[in-house]
């Protein structure tokens, strides 16, 4: 998919060439609270954050933020563990600073790529590459060391932004249509 104003080949680069790979720090489910600092736990990537872009952080903790890893706008997070290799290949874009990132999260931090574009690509064509490097049987693990050699295709930053905006608009449209379908199913079952 190309927009007419862009041309030229996309560059192929390993993640380690444009991202710093970090790991979150421990926040357990029982340390969540109704107040405090916004935080994201790895399990929430499977349950609360279904879209590539996290539009709102839904959890908080009162833990001391100075001892934990904080997000920076443009971070992409991927779980470090999961039940299957394909499940673990789940990337989410964090468009906020200072969100506390839980311990079982890989953090891809870059100011050279658009984070939402990266999340869409990691959940698309690269999902199977990520699943291939995950390790384990009953519990699958994935760490920065495994991610660093995944090859990503990158257009210029302006094209990354335009593509990710289009994909985000499509996600919003799909969510709206799904809500309409759910409402119609409820109406139908009430008759």
Each model region followed by its residue ranges:
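Short amphipathic coiled-coil heptad-repeat segments
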Residues: 1-8, 176-191
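A short glycine-rich beta-alpha junction/loop motif
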Residues: 99-105, 135-158
């Amino acid at each position: 998919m190309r927009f007419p104003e862009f041309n030229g080949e996309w560059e192929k680069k390993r993640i380690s060439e444009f991202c710093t790979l970090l790991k979150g720090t421990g926040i357990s489910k029982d340390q969540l609270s109704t107040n405090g600092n916004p935080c994201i736990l790895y399990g929430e990537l499977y349950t609360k954050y279904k879209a590539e872009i996290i539009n709102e952080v839904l959890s908080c903790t009162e833990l001391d933020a100075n001892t934990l890893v904080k997000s920076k706008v443009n971070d992409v997070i991927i779980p470090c563990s999961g039940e299957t290799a394909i499940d673990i290949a789940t990337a989410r874009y964090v468009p906020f600073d200072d969100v506390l990132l839980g311990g079982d999260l890989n953090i891809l931090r870059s100011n050279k790529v658009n984070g939402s574009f990266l999340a869409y690509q990691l959940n698309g064509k690269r999902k199977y590459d990520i699943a291939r490097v995950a390790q384990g049987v009953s519990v699958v693990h994935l760490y920065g060391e495994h991610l660093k050699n995944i090859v990503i295709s990158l257009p210029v930053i302006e094209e990354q932004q335009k593509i990710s905006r289009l994909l985000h608009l499509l996600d919003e449209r799909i969510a709206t249509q799904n809500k309409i379908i759910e409402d119609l199913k409820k109406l139908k079952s009430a008759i």
